[in-house]
Amino acid sequence: MTLTPPKKTHLKQLEAESIHIIREVAAEFDNPVMLYSIGKDSAVMLHLAMKAFAPGKPPFPLMHVDTTWKFREMITFRDQMAEKLGMKLLVHTNQEGVEQGIGPFTHGSAKHTDVMKTQALKQALDKYGFDAAFGGARRDEEKSRAKERVYSFRDKFHRWDPKNQRPELWNLYNGKVNKGESIRVFPLSNWTELDIWQYIYLENIDIVPLYYAAERPVVERDGTLIMVDDDRMPLEPGEQPMMKMVRFRTLGCYPLTGAVESEAATLPDIIQEMLLTTTSERQGRVIDHDGAASMEQKKREGYF
């Protein structure tokens, strides 16, 4: 009698693939790090890393690039999760940008993103000498990410060249890098937004409350609902925050992240909403609407 193993579900296949990638990087590279942006994808990636090395801890730290403009709830959640899981958390901020007063309102989204995110990330990777950095990007998010490999190679200046990528056959990954070079690793490349939410529900993964619909103070700017998270946000003449039932599909710096009107206050509600939506989650990212500062150009300059 021949026993055949039970067929894995779609989510279990994705889980196994991601865990394999995480273990491969831990085995191949000398000094890896997991970028923790505090969003839903980071939450899933961290959960997978904990599974990959259970009952031990992952053999690499978490790192968050803090632009100083993240939602307050995100920072609180970040610190709570690091303490709960017993993970080492590195937090890096571009102090030169802080001293220059760089911000989304004073310098615009493109300048703010370059100085406080891209340059800050490159500073941190150089400071700690990381040769591999995990990120939670998925191919279904945005067109430039759709053509990026799981192992995304970067030169000594952290730049990505989309015309110079290595083939990835089956589940074989070439991790050879020269001195000064590094890779960005995307274990969730083949997941969709719906996969992420279904996995969060099935695995009971903690996420930032901002993903759930609630009454929040917002103003409408150029058709985008921006949450007034603190008193640094300048209001235009006659503008008053409105209390609306909103949630966020994606999270970043609060002045550059649009909310969506929603009644989805539970995970099943969010999943149902995802089954019906016809727009990308990154439609709420203000930085993606600037053609001169497209995602591909940002990645060429060192953005994740």
Curated annotation (Swiss-Prot):
Its EC number is 2.7.7.4. It catalyses: sulfate + ATP + H(+) = adenosine 5'-phosphosulfate + diphosphate. The keyword Transmembrane does not apply. Gene3D superfamilies: HUPs. It is an enzyme of class 2 (transferase). Disulfide bonds: none annotated. GO terms for molecular function: ATP binding; sulfate adenylyltransferase (ATP) activity. Pathway: Sulfur metabolism; hydrogen sulfide biosynthesis; sulfite from sulfate: step 1/3. InterPro entries: PAPS_reduct_dom (IPR002500), Rossmann-like_a/b/a_fold (IPR014729), SO4_adenylTrfase_ssu (IPR011784), Sulfate_adenylyltrnsfr_sub2 (IPR050128). GO terms for biological process: hydrogen sulfide biosynthetic process; sulfate assimilation. Keywords: ATP-binding, Nucleotide-binding, Nucleotidyltransferase, Transferase. Belongs to the PAPS reductase family. CysD subfamily. With CysN forms the ATP sulfurylase (ATPS) that catalyzes the adenylation of sulfate producing adenosine 5'-phosphosulfate (APS) and diphosphate, the first enzymatic step in sulfur assimilation pathway. APS synthesis involves the formation of a high-energy phosphoric-sulfuric acid anhydride bond driven by GTP hydrolysis by CysN coupled to ATP hydrolysis by CysD. PANTHER family: SULFATE ADENYLYLTRANSFERASE SUBUNIT 2. This is Sulfate adenylyltransferase subunit 2 1. It comes from Marinobacter nauticus (strain ATCC 700491 / DSM 11845 / VT8). The gene is cysD1.
